[in-house]
């Protein structure tokens, strides 16, 4: 088999060489026959001075936002890297004189506000996760220190503060509720890090609302609403701008899908961004409070779909119940315990929203405010029941346990 392959390679080389030589011989013969007849007509090739107007709606849009898009540099202690650095931070691993720290990863950010001597930058939480120090590289090449104003792991957003001394422009946000599938979408950021800062790629909006599941550093999964685009998104684009044809920010670039869940098939053109309306809502709260308070039930849970058939049978569920969240344990003193929920209960609805997984439960729960009362539908010993749960506690009151999701 090896000899056959080598033979094919050699044959290809020989045929290719024959074609090249033949072409040379034909050219030689032709030029000799034409001889002096063509010499008097020979002219040198010149570059044509043609003026082309390259200004388009796309170039104008990029120009409007380019000065407000920055690179975010995450420094950590040597041999300490963020769990997210290999996913979307553009891991560089280069050493730095930044207080003896190492540049662990780079992402992107968007300057959206100037106030006094400060400027505010929105980026993804996973871009800054695990940092010991942060720098922001401006479009003009100046590198400035950044401090964290606040962050929210659930939505994967963070707000940084920098000096406004060298800040030229700030971005404006569009109303993401007015987006239309098929309209132009342009991603601006730092793919693979600051070496390619302010890279722009163009595509369209493929979808205006997708549920995207994220895995946090503690292993818990969350589900967020996202814009889908086929504009090229690469490692390092995280936290950058997705803009419309007017140069307004319609989303903060967050992630992309590169393969199917089982890894068997590669995919292209599946990029996601957090919608601008959601971004504005979160960053305003982060500026004020530094964190986002969300209601908590006070349970540890596991998806019904993750149970073995033997474990599922012990729950005595009707055959019509194929999805839900199994209460693994209940935290004393929190809303679920107060309302009478117990380990082994299977939650199938929160309010009017059907629950088939823990991400469904979180999405439904987080649509409510602290101190709201919500009806929870569940099954116990095969029978359906409901409980009115007053959401008097927040996620900050939860005990964490990596063996199961908490809420």
Curated annotation (Swiss-Prot):
GO cellular component labels: plasma membrane
Q: Which InterPro entries match?
A: Chloro_Bact_Ser_Proteases, PDZ, PDZ_sf, Peptidase_S1_PA, Peptidase_S1_PA_chymotrypsin, Peptidase_S1C
Keywords, A to Z, come to:
Cell membrane, Hydrolase, Membrane, Protease, Serine protease, Transmembrane, Transmembrane helix
Q: Which residues carry out catalysis? A: 126, 156, 238
Please give the PROSITE patterns that the UniProt record associates with this protein. Answer: PDZ
What PANTHER family does UniProt report for this protein, alphabetically? PEPTIDASE S12, PROTEASE DO-LIKE 8, CHLOROPLASTIC
Output this protein's name. Serine protease Do-like HtrA
């Amino acid at each position: 088999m090896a000899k056959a392959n080598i033979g094919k390679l050699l044959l290809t080389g020989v045929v290719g060489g024959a074609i090249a030589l033949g072409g040379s011989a034909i050219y030689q013969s032709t030029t000799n026959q034409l001889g002096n007849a063509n010499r008097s007509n020979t002219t040198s090739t010149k570059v044509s001075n043609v003026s082309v107007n390259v200004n388009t709606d796309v170039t104008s849009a990029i120009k409007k936002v380019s000065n407000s898009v920055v690179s975010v540099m995450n420094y950590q202690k040597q041999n300490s890297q963020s769990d997210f650095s290999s996913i979307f931070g553009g891991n560089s691993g280069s050493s730095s004189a930044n207080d003896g720290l190492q540049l662990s990863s780079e992402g992107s950010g968007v300057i959206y506000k100037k106030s006094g001597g400060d400027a505010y930058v929105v980026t993804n939480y996973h871009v800054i996760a695990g940092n010991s120090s942060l720098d922001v590289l401006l479009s003009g090449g100046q590198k400035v220190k950044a401090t964290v104003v606040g962050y929210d792991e659930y939505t994967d957003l963070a707000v940084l503060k920098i000096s406004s001394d060298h800040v030229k422009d700030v971005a404006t946000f569009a109303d993401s509720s007015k987006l239309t599938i098929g309209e132009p979408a342009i991603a601006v950021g730092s793919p693979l890090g600051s070496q390619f800062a302010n890279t722009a790629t163009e595509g369209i909006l493929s979808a205006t609302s997708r549920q995207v599941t994220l895995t946090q550093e503690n292993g818990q999964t969350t589900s967020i609403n996202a814009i889908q685009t086929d504009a090229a998104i690469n490692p390092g684009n995280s936290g950058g701008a997705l803009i419309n044809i007017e140069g307004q920010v319609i989303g903060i670039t967050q992630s992309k899908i590169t393969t199917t869940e089982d890894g068997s098939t590669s995919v292209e053109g599946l990029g996601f961004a957090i919608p601008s309306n959601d971004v504005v809502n979160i960053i305003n709260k982060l500026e004020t409070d530094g964190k986002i308070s969300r209601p908590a039930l006070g349970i540890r849970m596991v998806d019904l779909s993750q149970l073995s058939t033997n474990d599922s049978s012990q729950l005595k569920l009707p055959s019509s119940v194929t999805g839900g969240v199994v209460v693994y344990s209940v935290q004393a003193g929190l809303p679920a315990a107060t309302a009478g929920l117990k380990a082994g209960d299977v939650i199938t609805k929160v309010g009017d929203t059907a629950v088939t997984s823990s991400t469904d439960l979180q999405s439904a729960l987080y649509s409510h405010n602290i101190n709201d009362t919500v009806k929870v539908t569940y099954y116990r010993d095969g029978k359906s029941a409901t409980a009115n749960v007053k959401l008097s506690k927040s996620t900050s009151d939860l005990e964490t346990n990596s063996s199961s999701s908490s809420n």
